[in-house]
């Protein structure tokens, strides 16, 4: 019996020794790095903060109930701002706080071609990653110098319509320039916003977030025709945009298509419009576990615009859409091939269009 107990103790000891000890962040780091971490922490927590404030206000007896009821009625019935360009606050886009946010990774933008400010554009952003932080840095702030690189272009990053049903958080999103990704919203921004008014769509959406893993760029694009149809309807040129480093910000639990986990995630997506990848990044005081993204450079390549082709005699609208879709996919592949050896040296596989 004693030998069995000793054997068990030895086994437990070896198991514990095999578990890597967490890597803690040093206490003495430059103040700027602390502020960068704080900026990202607040950004990641903003939905929770807004919901906490809202429910706290609801808990105050009687005094605020009537204004809160009016506010909720206004959100659900009258306010159509998310589908009409939102309510962006210009100074917020240029706030120095976003420099700290972008400097955390750090995030960069590389321009391939000038964009005519008299035209409208649809930026297709790839990959989705877990939270699409690179898209926010690029299109919702001026921290990476977007406004200087593309003068006269006024982009709105689009997100799920359901996000604009969350009290207070919806107002924060619109203040940052975000709008709904609905068809109506896309058309309103591109046709009523004037010259230079543009939209940025994270094309892969929730499905692609399940493919987000370091060293991999599996894109959901083969059957994504919605943004192509919007381009044909509005005449807006397509601009392929690839971010190297987006998928490196978090690590995700592996789940193949036949696993129970993957099926569960897909059911959530069909029911709610978004999915729940099981991921982890780092914490405030450690490098191995938490909800903060890892510090990894993000290089966003903004490609050359692809104009909507003119309709040839006898050509149908569906043929135009498919032709433009093929051109866009080739442009994305070409963009990846030209920069992969610079910004994706540690990749474990090449770009693949999986859906």
From Swiss-Prot:
An example Gene Ontology CC term for this record: endoplasmic reticulum membrane
Instruction: Provide the residues annotated with a glycan attachment (glycosylation).
Output: 142
Q: List where in the cell it is found.
A: Endoplasmic reticulum membrane
Q: What class of enzyme is it?
A: transferase
Instruction: Return the Pfam families for the record.
Output: DAGAT
Q: For this protein, what is any one GO molecular function term?
A: diacylglycerol O-acyltransferase activity
**Annotated membrane topology:** Multi-pass membrane protein
What organism does the record attribute this protein to? Umbelopsis ramanniana (Oleaginous fungus)
What's the protein name?
Diacylglycerol O-acyltransferase 2A
Family per record: Belongs to the diacylglycerol acyltransferase family.
Where are its TM segments located?
41-61, 62-78
Report which gene this protein is encoded by.
Answer: DGAT2A
Q: What is its EC number?
A: 2.3.1.20
Task performed by this protein: Catalyzes the terminal and only committed step in triacylglycerol synthesis by using diacylglycerol and fatty acyl CoA as substrates. Required for storage lipid synthesis.
User: What superkingdom heads the lineage?
Assistant: Eukaryota
Keyword terms of this UniProt record: Acyltransferase, Endoplasmic reticulum, Glycerol metabolism, Glycoprotein, Lipid biosynthesis, Lipid metabolism, Membrane, Transferase, Transmembrane, Transmembrane helix
